[in-house]
Amino acid sequence: MAGFASRTRGVAAGGFDPTANYKRIDFVTMSSTGDATNFGSLTSNREGPMGLGNETRGIAAAGWSRPNSNNIQAIDFVTIASTGDSQNFGDLAQRTNYGAGAASPTRGLLIAGNIPAPGDMYNRIEFITIASQGDAQEFGELKHCLLYTSDAADEERG
């Protein structure tokens, strides 16, 4: 599941249960308690997408699609303050899932994950400029391949 937030909303996108993937996007209002509300849908069902965002935009990238077992290369975005379906942002260089995302207010990093060959892990880091749609670009590589990573970021650093 991809997660991202603004100061007022927390958003979760995608996910799975043992039989299916989901493309649903839900949100909560940070200042109150209660159940999540439907925000919209991703462009495709996906398990294990990477999430990142800034105060304005949320990004859900990559993932894995059941039942055809395909990794996804697409990057989707939403405007956090509104509701509605995601739109296409661009593509990653490699189809991957279960990587991590991190962001500053301007740049997002899409980090590592699992690639299509069974059991292969990916050590590449790609970046996007959150305000501008387009394909991810090479940022660098991790020293080691990682899978099922986690993410964190603040106002200054991813």
Where are the model-predicted features located?
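Repeated scaffold domains used in trafficking and secretory/extracellular systems
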Residues: 46-50, 96-100, 146-147
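Glycine-centered tight turns/hairpins at beta-strand boundaries that repeat
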Residues: 4-19, 30, 54-70, 80, ...
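Conserved small/polar residues in nucleotide/adenosyl-binding loops
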Residues: 148-156
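A detector of repeated loop/turn-to-beta-strand junctions in beta-rich toroidal repeat architectures
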Residues: 21-24, 36, 70-74, 86, ...
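A short beta-strand motif characteristic of beta-propeller blades
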Residues: 37-41, 87-91, 137-141
